[in-house]
Design a protein with these regions (language model features):
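NAD(P)-dependent short-chain dehydrogenase/reductase
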Residues: 125-127, 139, 151-211, 238-240
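Short alpha-helical oligomerization interface
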Residues: 82-96, 131-138
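NAD(P)H-binding glycine-rich loop region in Rossmannoid oxidoreductase-like domains
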Residues: 55-92
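C-terminal substrate-binding subdomain of Rossmann-fold SDR/epimerase-dehydratase oxidoreductases
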Residues: 189-309
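Active-site YXXXK catalytic motif of short-chain dehydrogenase/reductase
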Residues: 93, 142, 146
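Conserved Rossmann-fold NAD(P)-dependent oxidoreductase catalytic core, especially the SDR/UDP-sugar
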Residues: 75, 99-141
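N-terminal Rossmann NAD(P)H-binding glycine-rich loop of SDR-like oxidoreductase domains
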Residues: 3-23
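SDR active-site strand-loop-helix element
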Residues: 6, 30, 73-77, 111-117, ...
Length: 309
């Protein structure tokens, strides 16, 4: 099987690529390295690595001419690093997704897409949120653009699976609270802890389910989540423990320091029905895997999709 992975140097894309190669599949990587990192590709054998933006129509032409067939597309590429960058969100998450969807139409192949839980807004009235809950992504430019991309896929007629995600963390996680905590603690800086909860789930668990989708399992939209949330302060304490510090770092606690909703829980019932869900890694395993990665490769910057006022 030949699988194209956009954002292949990112956290999700690189883990999926490694699992595909481990079972003998051929992988094509596309990444512009805006947030993906070259070291995430070190374990891959593939010679097909395109450093390009998915918003470039020339990439569409290049892939169309170079490959006679592509059996599946795993579309993880997204613009999220700057919550205020509307133009890049539109170019990458809307136009880029439309072009990738056209590519799936050309090759008549399955498309796997990844959506943010903020597609439901910042204060859904039902918890856990059911799949049929109305999409109203007004909380951020990122959510609006990702949802626009999802709508294009749905009206395109391609065979697709969309995973609407809880907070995916673990090795190679470079956005959100986990790498921020590690970076600030390592620098001797105070962390700011929000009075909020999030559903944290390991990227390695997600990657195994994505492989099932590549192989034809499922159809349409799914929640990838544990259905349980964790206080941000508890995640912080797990990070401190995993760093094996001989002191207790100071932190500031604020009601809603990071912005965003106090919690969004996603109902994973349909996912458990249609996929062979793995035993989910514990939060301790997930944090430990992330810290091991940071100790080896570092954290270069703090990344969030939330708007900065």
């Amino acid at each position: 099987m030949r699988v194209l992975i956009t954002g292949g140097a990112g956290m999700v894309g690189s883990h999926v690529a490694e699992l595909l190669e481990a079972r003998g599949d051929e992988v094509i990587i596309v990444d512009n390295f805006a947030t993906g990192r070259p070291e995430h590709l070190l374990n891959l054998r593939t010679q097909y690595k395109f450093e390009d933006s998915i918003a470039n129509e020339s990439l569409y032409a290049k892939l169309s001419s170079q490959f006679l067939n592509i059996d599946a597309i795993v579309h993880t590429a997204a613009s999220f690093a700057n919550g205020n960058d509307w133009s890049d969100h539109i170019n990458t998450n809307v136009l880029g997704t439309a072009l990738i969807t056209r590519l799936a139409q050309k090759f008549n192949c399955r498309l796997i897409y990844f959506q943010t839980a903020l597609c439901y807004g910042d204060n859904p009235t039902i918890q856990p949120v059911p799949l049929e809950y109305p999409r109203q992504p007004m909380a951020s430019s990122y959510a609006i653009s990702k949802t626009a991309g999802e709508f294009y896929i749905e009206q395109s007629g391609v065979d697709f699976v969309t995973f609407r995600l809880a907070n995916i963390v673990g090795p190679r996680n470079l956005s959100g609270p986990l790498p921020i905590f590690y970076k600030r603690i390592s620098a001797g800086e105070k962390c700011v802890i929000a009075n909020a909860k999030r559903d944290f789930i390991d990227v390695r668990n997600l990657a195994t389910v994505v492989l099932q989708a590549i192989d034809g399992r499922g159809n349409g939209a799914y929640h990838f989540s544990s259905g349980k949330d964790v206080q941000i302060i508890d995640l912080y304490k797990k990070v401190v423990s995993a760093m094996r510090l001989d002191f207790e770092p100071e932190y500031d606690f604020q009601e809603n320091a990071a912005g965003g909703p106090p919690s969004i829980l996603l109902d994973p019932t349909r996912t458990y029905s249609d996929f062979d869900m793995p035993t989910l890694n514990s939060i301790e395993e997930t944090v430990s895997g992330a810290i091991s990665y940071y100790e080896k490769f570092g954290v270069t910057r703090e990344v969030t999709h939330l708007k900065k006022n």
